Amino acid sequence: MAVSFVTTSPEEEDKPKLGLGNIQTPLIFNPSMLNLQANIPNQFIWPDDEKPSINVLELDVPLIDLQNLLSDPSSTLDASRLISEACKKHGFFLVVNHGISEELISDAHEYTSRFFDMPLSEKQRVLRKSGESVGYASSFTGRFSTKLPWKETLSFRFCDDMSRSKSVQDYFCDALGHGFQPFGKVYQEYCEAMSSLSLKIMELLGLSLGVKRDYFREFFEENDSIMRLNYYPPCIKPDLTLGTGPHCDPTSLTILHQDHVNGLQVFVENQWRSIRPNPKAFVVNIGDTFMALSNDRYKSCLHRAVVNSESERKSLAFFLCPKKDRVVTPPRELLDSITSRRYPDFTWSMFLEFTQKHYRADMNTLQAFSDWLTKPI
């Protein structure tokens, strides 16, 4: 397969952030071929101030044991305190004894490997379309022309809604054929488990913020979420590129399961720290939408993924999102005469469209979106 390279004019590279533009001649991301070259294409090389630091210190994140948690008042109080401290500082914590079977997690990783092992032509049958958040993406080569991530992804929607009870299974069968029903069955079950887990976590977040225990659980009960399979191939020049660039998740809550390979890094106190893979734990982090719901009390923290020259890395990311027409506004308990509103009301559909059509997610996405909402017409 031939590899075509993108050339961008200085004018195109200087385009403002809120105009992503369309790339006419996208680069084909084929890592096995790119790794045969002496260097990686310029589109994958990040600026010096954003290049990765591979050997970084480990981040101390609290480990929350969910076993019998919500039925034990003392344990619940301790957990909510630890979560509050972490979410005010960097927004990351781990959960164990979460009730998700090891077999299901293993199957989800296995089918991730099977999908990304398929020929490119097969994966492109579900190619992500411009302006959409679902489908297969090959390093976002058709969306951006610079600072490309060294990864492939497959994203699909999960609707925790009785009227669309098999949305994931239907996606795989409709998009790829009935031969992919086993894929759909595994990821349908996995997403249902993630949705259930996220609602438990929402109870703890509510308690930690001093609002009614069921407030956030009820807010997200009929969620319209996103599941993403991430594949980071080995790279001959891992010191020049990133698997995922620095960003804050625009969604509400991310539940991540890593394989055994290091790669996740979080920016805390002006330095990058790593979160070591733990096969028995899920990494949980606050996203921009929940930061708005908490009226800025909890932080959506900058994070990224690095790659290496020896091992491929895979991860499973479930992004909890509210129903698309649900108005995101803080509960009254988080507002008073002293604490003013930090962000205007919005719906998830508005924010999602902003990130897909107008803005490349980074550490300022929520503020840029707020400015965009309130700018004079």
Curated annotation (Swiss-Prot):
Query: To which pathway does this protein belong?
Result: Plant hormone biosynthesis; gibberellin biosynthesis
Q: What reactions does this protein catalyze?
A: gibberellin A12 + 2 2-oxoglutarate + 3 O2 + H(+) = gibberellin A9 + 2 succinate + 3 CO2 + 2 H2O; gibberellin A12 + 2-oxoglutarate + O2 = gibberellin A15 + succinate + CO2; gibberellin A15 + 2-oxoglutarate + O2 = gibberellin A24 + succinate + CO2 + H2O; gibberellin A53 + 2-oxoglutarate + O2 = gibberellin A44 + succinate + CO2
Which PANTHER family does the UniProt record give? 2-OXOGLUTARATE (2OG) AND FE(II)-DEPENDENT OXYGENASE SUPERFAMILY PROTEIN-RELATED (PTHR47990)
Q: Does the keyword Metal-binding apply?
A: yes
What is the originating organism of this protein? Arabidopsis thaliana (Mouse-ear cress)
InterPro entries, from UniProt? DIOX_N, IPNS-like_FE2OG_OXY, IPNS-like_sf, Iron_ascorbate_oxido_reductase, Oxoglu/Fe-dep_dioxygenase_dom
Source taxonomy = Eukaryota, Viridiplantae, Streptophyta, Embryophyta, Tracheophyta
Entry keyword set = Iron, Metal-binding, Oxidoreductase
Q: What is this protein called?
A: Gibberellin 20 oxidase 1
Report the cofactors.
Fe(2+); L-ascorbate
GO biological process terms, alphabetically, are:
gibberellic acid mediated signaling pathway; gibberellin biosynthetic process; leaf development; response to gibberellin; short-day photoperiodism, flowering
Question: Cellular component GO terms, alphabetically?
Answer: cytoplasm
What tissue specificity is annotated for this entry? Highly expressed in stems and inflorescence tissues. Detected in seeds, roots, leaves and siliques.
Tell me, according to the record, the phenotype of the null mutant.
Semi-dwarf.
Protein task: GA53 is less effectively oxidized than GA12 and is only oxidized one step to GA44. Involved in the promotion of the floral transition, fertility and silique elongation, but plays only a minor role in elongation of seedling organs. Acts redundantly with GA20OX2.
Binding positions for Fe cation per the UniProt entry: 247, 249, 303
On cofactor binding, the record's note says: Binds 1 Fe(2+) ion per subunit.
Question: EC number(s) for this protein?
Answer: 1.14.11.-
What switches on its expression?
Answer: Circadian-regulation. Up-regulated by auxin, paclobutrazol and cold treatment. Negatively controlled by the level of physiologically active gibberellin.
Source gene? GA20OX1
Tell me the GO molecular function terms: gibberellin 20-oxidase activity; metal ion binding
According to the UniProt record, what happens if one changes residue 310 to K? Answer: In strain: cv Landsberg erecta
Q: State the source organism's domain of life.
A: Eukaryota
- Protein family: Belongs to the iron/ascorbate-dependent oxidoreductase family. GA20OX subfamily.
